[in-house]
């Protein structure tokens, strides 16, 4: 029996579990029960879909027993079990990316960090918070071989063993007596696992009074079910309280915070299905990862099918957690069927409509609550405006933007309501931080005319805002595309000449130099041709790995009425330096880095010295 070493990342994880999360150690039981429930789900599915498993006779259950003398706690299930390879893969190693992500997310807050354990799929190891040693005895159905896995958190062994029935039995050799109290265990089970869909039996001590006068009674052990073991989503809404929903959410999400919102729907008619969705009050750890884990579980007639199907909801709703339970899908549904099945598509469309509708209700009835939601998930929601989403109009109603007038978040309907009668378009500015955008020279004319502009400072706004086109039949335009040509005086030959000379001095830096029709106070501003990507869009392309993009040069617009331009027309002896200063100042006002800071400082110093 050779001892095996844990992989480096597992040792790192175990140290964190034992030393960092100790104050919230009761969650070990939640995790082991959750794993047992998953094992029962898998066997239940096979017993309904695979001929060789249909002949099995067993009772799906989880059993927890105590031995106070030996200081052991044992969790057993009648689920799918594991073979030798699965023991090695499941308990000896962890996917490196998962461990790295887990460690990066640790905050030092024991309560928050303990939630991550289940979310990252490393819950089994939490048992080492309460146990010095763990023994796993397991056997798969249809197999004659059983195996044991033993570990003291330093190394582990796997060897053949004897086990009469299939399933898994986990024995913890406890460090202290806290979790040998059956009443303490019962409270933990009801707190975290009350709605696990399988019965959880707990060994409890029952006091039996003596039948003879003067004699003391004694304690007897009994095993009884302690959880409700019902599919909560199948219960009538009238029978459920808000706390029931909150408790169920915590069970399925491994999140100790109450959700912001729950949506419980039962549909009858051509297709029968039940959905129970939750919007979390904290961001899932993998919200902005490409390989995010789906938060929605699919059931067919209460039979668990999968929790790894991203097809159940569109990516822009990936923050949603919950259950979809459909009556008339085949039990052996495949990923291809999920993508193409008409019933599934109907349920998905109805679910999306319901979720967006409930969010709109919250937006209209509870602004504070909706603002919290939008701060958490607004960026993700806006991804639904990309491409040809059929829900684009509904999503657009839910989007909030900072107002250039108040700095507060407003929606497009509020913007339209405050528009002057002569204003025919909705204006926005994007491509930088909020403060930079708010102070951009591009807004000078809008501020002068008291026209509100939407400050779109999310990175994704640079991509999606040009794609929207209109809201409620009102065009949506970038401030760069606004036309104020009627408000400017005549452009003289001298103006055109100085613009051309500045262009000559900036020939490698700009596409063109033009007399601005939009500036009032600023010296200059950089804009881009309509089909050219601006600085923010170029940065996004690079983040996406498109490093070898052709160079795209901006257009420099100058303010002909600015004192510096007037003096430059009169005295062009320093036009080379001043041209570069104007360009660099325009870049800085857009929040961009200048190419050569030392050269800029030198030019400015020399010009100031001459002016003094």
UniProtKB/Swiss-Prot annotation:
Coiled coil: none annotated. Keywords: ATP-binding, Chaperone, Cytoplasm, Nucleotide-binding, Stress response. Residues 1-335 are annotated as: A. Molecular chaperone. Has ATPase activity. Homodimer. Pfam families: HATPase_c_3, HSP90. It is found in: Cytoplasm. Belongs to the heat shock protein 90 family. Residues 336-539 are annotated as: B. PROSITE patterns: HSP90. The keyword Nucleotide-binding applies. This is Chaperone protein HtpG. It comes from Campylobacter hominis (strain ATCC BAA-381 / DSM 21671 / CCUG 45161 / LMG 19568 / NCTC 13146 / CH001A). InterPro entries: HATPase_C_sf, Heat_shock_protein_90_CS, HSP90_C, Hsp90_fam, Hsp90_N, Ribosomal_Su5_D2-typ_SF. NCBIfam families: PRK05218.1. It comes from the Bacteria. GO terms for molecular function: ATP binding; ATP hydrolysis activity; ATP-dependent protein folding chaperone; unfolded protein binding. SUPFAM superfamilies: ATPase domain of HSP90 chaperone/DNA topoisomerase II/histidine kinase, HSP90 C-terminal domain, Ribosomal protein S5 domain 2-like. The keyword Kinase does not apply. GO terms for cellular component: cytoplasm. Signal peptide: none annotated. Residues 540-612 are annotated as: C.
